[in-house]
């Protein structure tokens, strides 16, 4: 009986007023989320200007001039070697009497070559040589356009006469020369536009080159003035005090 009472005493019922013991739970303070740094606004893309556009197309414009010059030279050589120019009127072959396919072609090739070289090696003498060559090339192209238009007007009058003639070698040659003049007129206008665009770019480049030294001078003054003042301060601080 004593053992039974002792075991019942050990099995005491829990007191409902006492709170049940629970393991201590450590509460970690949650750190506040880090504030996101404000993102810098993206820099706007650089504005596309005529200068930046032409700078990308310099070599293309130079190659265009070289090709136009070579085509004009080929046409002039083929026509003069296959046709007896003395058998035709001067008005029909005004283009070749003036020698435009030859001197015009040489000027186009020269200006195109200098434009390509000045784009690859941006030296002062090449840039200014390219500018001068393109000015001469644009003048030559303008004269060539005038000669070609005059040649077309003369050929059109001769072609009206050839409408009533079915078989005539002179009319056939005149028709061929007219088509050739039209093709050369298109190529000459293309060379003229290329030369004018290159002149515009080179003149703008010369203006920028003349402005750069003044800007650099002001930048150097702004950059080096605090450096000089800092050096003066350090010299004064490190100077020994003479008693």
From Swiss-Prot:
GO molecular function list: IgE binding; phosphoprotein binding; protein kinase binding; SH2 domain binding
Q: How is it modified after translation?
A: Phosphorylated on tyrosine residues by LYN.
UniProt keyword rRNA-binding present: no
Q: What is its main location?
A: membrane
Q: According to the UniProt topology, which residue ranges lie Extracellular?
A: 80-97, 151-179
Q: At what positions is Phosphotyrosine found? A: 218, 224, 228
UniProt subcellular location = Membrane
Origin superkingdom? Eukaryota
* TM helices/strands, residue ranges: 60-79, 98-117, 131-150, 180-199
UniProt xrefs under Pfam families? CD20
One GO CC annotation: external side of plasma membrane
Parts of the chain on the Cytoplasmic side? 1-59, 118-130, 200-243
State the similarity comment.
Belongs to the MS4A family.
Function noted in UniProt: High affinity receptor that binds to the Fc region of immunoglobulins epsilon. Aggregation of FCER1 by multivalent antigens is required for the full mast cell response, including the release of preformed mediators (such as histamine) by degranulation and de novo production of lipid mediators and cytokines. Also mediates the secretion of important lymphokines. Binding of allergen to receptor-bound IgE leads to cell activation and the release of mediators responsible for the manifestations of allergy.
What name is this protein filed under? High affinity immunoglobulin epsilon receptor subunit beta
Q: Which species is this UniProt entry from?
A: Rattus norvegicus (Rat)
